[in-house]
């Protein structure tokens, strides 16, 4: 394996873990504030229930959707995880130059924008 590919994989794994951990914390906060309609974390929840929130977010979620009382539509908080994953995979298949990786990433983002009619690039993965 060459050095650039190893660095890309390290960055991918590191980003993956960080994004999922942040999503877990963010999801719990939103669940408490918006879905349960309470201002603070619910004290009657057991640790097991909060742990299941964390695990479902950490292992299963790459996005978090929520709606507040004053919001008509769902607001989706998205991450670049899928784009990074696809970009790293394509770089591994087609070469390891930074230009190729950037080109693939831009093409993927443009395709996703048109597919989902979304004006926020990070949210169209």
UniProtKB/Swiss-Prot annotation:
Source superkingdom: Eukaryota
Record key words, sorted: Membrane, Transmembrane, Transmembrane helix
GO cellular component, one term: membrane
Transmembrane segments annotated in the record for this chain: 7-29
Locations listed in the record: Membrane
Membrane topology of this protein: Single-pass membrane protein
Keyword Transmembrane helix on entry: yes
Record has Membrane as a keyword: yes
Name under which the protein is recorded: Uncharacterized protein YLR122C
Species for this entry: Saccharomyces cerevisiae (strain ATCC 204508 / S288c)
